[in-house]
């Protein structure tokens, strides 16, 4: 993932991770486009290069980008239910006006409230960028 801070052009490729969630402030819509990709190291370089796809998105003031590992969306509660992508998107919408640090803390709080005391066995990692 590369963000040109002069033009606010975001470029990303998938190499085994989840597609970023982008909240567009002016339209209040979520953009999350799956693109072709494969985890790094699974195939040789020529095959990897032929599979990988790059996506460019023009961001504007107030737009929010959230990347995350599947440990967030696959977090399980005591009923063996996953928190899920829709819940993550709703949490982003709910906390979208927060500064980035609080946004991440509040999403984490939503996930932990859902799972309760159930041990999790996957990492839960997030990164958020808000365009000024």
What does each model-identified segment do?
Residues 1-132:
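Conserved subregion of the PPM/PP2C metallophosphatase catalytic domain
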């Amino acid at each position: 993932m590369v963000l040109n801070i002069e033009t606010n052009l975001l470029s990303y490729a998938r190499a085994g991770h989840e597609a970023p969630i982008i909240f567009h402030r002016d339209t209040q819509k979520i953009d999350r486009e799956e693109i072709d990709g494969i985890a790094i190291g699974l195939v040789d370089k020529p095959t990897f290069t032929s599979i990988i796809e790059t996506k460019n998105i023009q961001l504007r003031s107030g737009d929010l980008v959230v990347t995350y590992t599947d440990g967030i969306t696959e977090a399980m509660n005591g009923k063996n239910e996953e928190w899920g992508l829709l819940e993550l998107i709703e949490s982003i919408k709910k906390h979208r006006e927060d500064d980035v640090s609080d946004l991440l803390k509040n999403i984490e709080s939503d996930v932990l409230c859902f799972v309760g005391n159930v041990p999790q066995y996957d990492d839960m990692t997030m990164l958020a960028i808000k365009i000024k």
